[in-house]
Amino acid sequence: MEDLDALLSDLETTTSHMSRLGAPKERPPETLTPPPPYGHQPQTGSGESSGTTGDKDHLYSTVCKPRSPKPVAPVAPPFSSSSGVLGNGLCELDRLLQELNATQFNITDEIMSQFPSSKMAEGEEKEDQSEDKSSPTVPPSPFPAPSKPSATSATQELDRLMASLSDFRVQNHLPASGPPQPPAASPTREGCPSPPGQTSKGSLDTMLGLLQSDLSRRGVPTQAKGLCGSCNKPIAGQVVTALGRAWHPEHFLCSGCSTTLGGSSFFEKDGAPFCPECYFERFSPRCGFCNQPIRHKMVTALGTHWHPEHFCCVSCGEPFGEEGFHEREGRPYCRRDFLQLFAPRCQGCQGPILDNYISALSALWHPDCFVCRECLAPFSGGSFFEHEGRPLCENHFHAQRGSLCATCGLPVTGRCVSALGRRFHPDHFTCTFCLRPLTKGSFQERASKPYCQPCFLKLFG
């Protein structure tokens, strides 16, 4: 900064000296003597110096040094001493600017690298336009102009440096509403340029900071909404909140198939998100009939899980009603099919036995079916007779065996008389004509009827 102050002091001294030279007052055309070959040169020099002084007063107003008033000086001889003084002053100014440029080159590059190139281009275009407007147009002269030192390169370099410093000062006074800006890189020593990686990183951070500040001034929130549960980086835009954490929408993925779960439903298992397909395929119970995952309603029976539409009778395929189901070898059956297939059968009607039954003759019987197989009469007193595996009443039992009295038709339980291929009670074996008992055992037979000897002789003798 000391070199800059010295440069400004020398510039002000040179400008004051040029101002004291003054500009020649314009005279009426008729009183002027014919100008020398270079008569237009002092007017051009004074115009340039006045224009340059005005521009510099405008550009370097931040120095806040008073300007000496312009004294009214007499007309100077054309381009005699003023050109020499101006040339010496400009040479001195060029030398000082070269020294300043060599000293502050790295600082200028570092400051300029922190601003977009569009600002520099716009600033240079505005400076060129302002210089074009401030400098008066000089008509072309038929006489060749003498060569003299030019201040264009030196003043442009100084203007660019001052514009960079002004932008840097404005950058330091940004409003506090935005995020804190990264600190400016410290100036490096001459001959040791900063690494390109640090310069590009600083420029990128500065541009991001300016963008966030602009968005904050426009009312757009740029504060981080937490760290992403996947990449562990701050979230500034859209956010997905799930499982007690925040996620970038593109990072909230299914743990099975890596499908984005931003706006769809998901399931959680051990702290990890899953899409419905992966969750059901991996963790849902399987149906005992079709072996497919169960997604909605489920029936639990026989130690396994079932789809409601698949929990049905394995025989007829009908769903179970209010009567429930019966199980056989781990398979469910409806009541009708279970009894039809596995219930004990009645020996009389061959139907399934549901409730009470009678066990007799090595078989099971419905109480209503255990009757005499000939007359279908129930057994009185609970006693029955068996003949060839069939339950019979006493009469039909003796009838089947031939043990009924041929006279009275009642069973012969005690002593009996066997004659004519039949059995008789002893009291009922009598003569057919006189009805006398044939106790002595002698009788005559005629047409399968017994007769005593006298009656037989009497009737058929």
From Swiss-Prot:
Record-annotated LIM zinc-binding domain positions: 226-285, 286-343, 344-403, 404-461
Pfam families for the chain: LIM (PF00412), Paxillin (PF03535)
Keyword Endoplasmic reticulum tagged: no
Complex and partners: Homooligomer. Interacts with PPARG. Interacts with TRAF4. Interacts with CRIP2. Interacts with HSPB1. Interacts with ILK. Interacts with LIMS1 and LIMS2. Interacts with NCK2. Interacts with NUDT16L1. Interacts with PAK. Interacts with PTPN12. Interacts with TCF3. Interacts with TCF7L2. Interacts with VCL. Interacts (via LD motif 3) with GIT1. Also interacts with GIT2. Forms a complex with ARHGEF7. Interacts with AR/androgen receptor in a ligand-dependent manner. Interacts with CSK. Interacts with PTK2/FAK1 and PTK2B/PYK2. Interacts with SLC6A3. Interacts with SLC6A4. Interacts with NR3C1.
Low complexity biased stretches: 44-53
Effect recorded for residue 38 to F: Reduced phosphorylation. Loss of phosphorylation
Name of the molecule in the record: Transforming growth factor beta-1-induced transcript 1 protein
Organism, as annotated: Mus musculus
Residues carrying Phosphoserine: 68, 141, 164, 186, 194, 403
Positions of the UniProt region annotated as Interaction with PTK2/FAK1: 83-136
Gene Ontology CC entries for this record: cytoskeleton; cytosol; focal adhesion; nuclear matrix
Consequence the record notes for mutating residue 372 to A: Loss of localization to focal adhesion
Predominant localisation class: other
LD motif 4 (motif): residue ranges: 203-215
Residue ranges, compositional bias (Pro residues): 137-147
Tissue: Ubiquitously expressed. Higher expression is detected in lung and spleen. Expression decreases during pregnancy in mammary glands. Expressed in all brain areas, with higher levels in cerebellum, prefrontal cortex and hypothalamus. Expressed in smooth muscle, myoepithelial cells and platelets (at protein level). Preferentially expressed in mesenchymal versus epithelial cells (at protein level).
InterPro entries named among the record's database cross-references: Paxillin_TGFB1I1_LIM_dom1, PDZ-LIM_domain, Tgfb1i1/Leupaxin/TGFB1I1, Znf_LIM
